[in-house]
């Protein structure tokens, strides 16, 4: 196998072989466009609009009331008419304890939770895009392997045909060579279909017309080990911090609600005799201490629950990061070993066996076995690279690698 063929395969493993896919796409571009095309942004904006409207209502004082009352209406002559009373009162409830600010604080905390949740949802979109991108890269690399296999099978079929014509090999050798060529072409068709299907799924996620995308050039076989210090994604911690602020705001609201509100009222009273009086009143409800303590205790328990959930989540995420990093390292070693040792050896073996076969030193079966060994080595290399990049997808999600791409501009 010429060394240039191996170099071309490794340098362009991500390149699409079909001219139908005309628009190159990098992973960063794919993530940016998928997030922009997702209706998740409109849904999150609607949720925020709802909460902003709720906040406006929460930041208002209680509604004033106006009451009109007529008393002593009846039948009894002028003496009774002089006892008619018409009273108009204006009533206002005076909130105490900072209830208004506490209500607004709860809604502000809800808004923070929604924003943190929105960022997590956008990061999940990025993860879905990255997973599809890896699938498309693997499919493109498989196409390259299949194309190389077809090229080798064609050369071998011609060589065997010449030997059969010269009566140096039996007829079945030519039949077997043609069968292997047909099998290689079928595998190429299947690989191209899988590649096109992966790109179609990518186009659907991006909201693009199918048939206009191709994965940008890169090296699918380049692998790297994770860095030593990896921490959970800040966005995953941020939502717990937002929930913590929400629990603290709810506690302040319940503490403020423990103070009863003062209600004042006043107004004129018109008497049937022609006299005018002024009425005024003050109302102060008695505290329900048991209910207040219960509400405060519930809010405190919710705050403790958020802290406990955060501790559990961080514990689990650190374990998941360690496992994902180990998988990335393990698969990177496998890719490097197969790429740098197994595949070159299989290429040299096939080249040497073919040279010996042309000199009459080997049989067609020897060449066929060497060809199969090379194909299996390359396929194993692509499978290992696929597992490596899939493990990288999980690790990137846990560490929030693409947060900067999915954040909304401020």
Features from the language model and the residues they span:
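Amphipathic alpha-helical coiled-coil segments
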Residues: 41-58, 114, 121, 125-150, ...
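Bacterial Sec-pathway N-terminal export signals of envelope proteins
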Residues: 21-70, 93-95, 102, 168-171, ...
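N-terminal signal peptide c-region/cleavage motif recognized by signal peptidases
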Residues: 17-18
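Small/polar-residue-enriched beta-strand and adjacent coil segments characteristic
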Residues: 24-26, 64-121, 238, 243-314, ...
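Short, charged, amphipathic alpha-helical segments
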Residues: 104-108, 171-180, 364-372
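Hydrophobic helical h-region of N-terminal Sec-dependent signal peptides
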Residues: 9-14
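Periplasmic alpha-helical coiled-coil/stalk elements that build and connect Gram-negative outer-membrane
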Residues: 121-233, 324-327, 331
């Amino acid at each position: 196998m010429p060394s240039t063929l191996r170099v071309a395969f490794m340098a362009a493993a991500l390149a699409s072989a079909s001219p139908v896919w005309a628009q190159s796409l990098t992973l960063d571009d794919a993530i940016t466009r998928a997030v922009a095309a997702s209706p998740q942004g409109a849904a999150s904006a609607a949720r925020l609009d709802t909460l902003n409207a709720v906040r406006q209502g929460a930041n208002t004082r209680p509604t004033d009331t106006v009451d009109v009352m007529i008393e002593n209406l009846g039948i009894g002559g002028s003496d009774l008419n002089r006892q008619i009373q018409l009273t108009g009162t204006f009533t206002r409830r005076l909130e105490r304890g900072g209830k208004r600010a506490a209500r607004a604080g709860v809604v502000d905390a809800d808004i923070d939770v929604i924003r943190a949740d929105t960022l997590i949802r956008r990061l999940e979109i990025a993860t879905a895009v990255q997973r599809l991108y890896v699938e498309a890269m693997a499919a493109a690399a498989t196409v390259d392997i299949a194309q190389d296999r077809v090229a080798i099978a064609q050369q071998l079929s011609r060589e065997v045909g010449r030997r059969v014509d010269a009566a140096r090999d039996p007829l079945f050798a030519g039949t077997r060579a043609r069968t292997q060529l047909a099998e290689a072409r079928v595998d190429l068709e299947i690989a191209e279909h899988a590649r096109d299907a992966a790109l179609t799924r990518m186009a659907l996620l991006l909201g693009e017309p199918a048939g206009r995308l191709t994965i940008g050039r890169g090296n699918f076989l380049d692998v790297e080990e994770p860095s030593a210090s990896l921490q959970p994604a800040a966005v995953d911690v941020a939502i717990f911090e937002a929930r913590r602020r929400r629990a603290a705001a709810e506690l302040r609201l319940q503490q403020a609600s423990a103070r009863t509100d003062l209600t004042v009222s006043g107004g004129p009273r018109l008497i049937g005799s022609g006299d005018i009086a002024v009425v005024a009143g003050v109302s102060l409800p008695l505290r329900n201490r048991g209910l207040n303590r219960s509400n405060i205790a519930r809010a405190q328990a919710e705050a403790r629950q958020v802290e406990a959930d955060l501790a559990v989540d961080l514990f689990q995420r650190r374990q998941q990061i360690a496992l994902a990093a180990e998988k990335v390292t393990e698969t990177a070693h496998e890719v490097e070993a197969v790429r740098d040792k197994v595949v070159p050896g299989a290429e040299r073996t096939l080249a040497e066996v073919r040279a010996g076969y042309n000199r009459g030193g080997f049989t067609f079966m020897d060449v066929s076995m060497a060809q199969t060994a090379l194909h299996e080595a390359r396929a194993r290399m692509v499978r290992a690279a696929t597992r490596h990049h899939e493990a990288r997808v999980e690790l990137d999600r846990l560490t929030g690698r693409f947060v900067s791409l999915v954040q909304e501009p401020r």
